[in-house]
Every structure is written in C-alpha cells, then in structure tokens.
From Swiss-Prot:
Keywords: Amidation, Amphibian defense peptide, Antibiotic, Antimicrobial, Cleavage on pair of basic residues, Fungicide, Lipid-binding, Membrane, Secreted, Signal, Target cell membrane, Target membrane. Amphipathic alpha-helical antimicrobial peptide with moderate to potent activity against Gram-positive bacteria, Gram-negative bacteria and fungi. Also shows a weak activity against biofilm of both Gram-positive and Gram-negative bacteria. Probably acts by disturbing membrane functions with its amphipathic structure. Kills fungi via membranolytic action. Enhanced sterol levels in lipid composition membranes reduce interaction of this peptide with membranes, having a protective effect against the lytic ability of the peptide. Shows anticancer activity. GO terms for biological process: defense response to bacterium; defense response to fungus; killing of cells of another organism. This is Aurein-2.5. It is found in: Secreted; Target cell membrane. One of its GO terms (molecular function) is lipid binding. Its main location: secreted. Residues 38-47 have a biased composition (Basic and acidic residues). Belongs to the frog skin active peptide (FSAP) family. Aurein subfamily. C-terminal amidation enhances antibacterial activity. This increase may be due to stabilization of the alpha-helical structure at the membrane interface. The modification Leucine amide is found at residue 65. Residues 23-49, 69-72 form a propeptide. Residues 1-22 form the signal peptide.
Length: 72
C-alpha cells in the first residue's frame, strides 16, 4: 500500500511540475503576442499619421490654387 501511495504522489508531483511549465510557456507566448500586437498597432498609427499629413498637404495645395484662381 505504501508503494502505491508513493507512486501516486510521484505521478501527481510530476503532473503538477509539467503543468506549471506549460502555464509558464503559455504566459510567455501571450506576452510575446501582446508585444507584437502593440508594435503592429504603433506601426499602423504611424502610417495613419503619415497619410493624414499627405492629405493635409494636398488639400492645402488645392486650397491655395483655388485662392489664386479667385484673385485672377
């Protein structure tokens, strides 16, 4: 009976150790995914800002052309 108890405790202990290792790897993967998502979001906002600047310049150029035509 003592042999069965020791075997059972050993199996449970090894199971808990492997479970904790899996949880640790899972948390690390989630952190990596969060970092990648944050980096992608930053790149997207930079692209939006760059596009917004271009649109402002184009609108400003057309606005100044319209003012020149009104003066003539």
């Amino acid at each position: 009976m003592a042999f069965l108890k020791k075997s059972l405790f050993l199996v449970l202990f090894l199971g808990l150790v492997s479970l904790s290792i899996c949880e640790k790897e899972k948390r690390q993967n989630e952190e990596d995914e969060d970092e990648n998502e944050a980096a992608n979001h930053e790149e997207g906002s930079e692209e939006k800002r760059g596009l917004f600047d271009i649109v402002k310049k184009v609108v400003g150029a057309f606005g100044s052309l319209g003012k020149r035509n009104d003066l003539e």
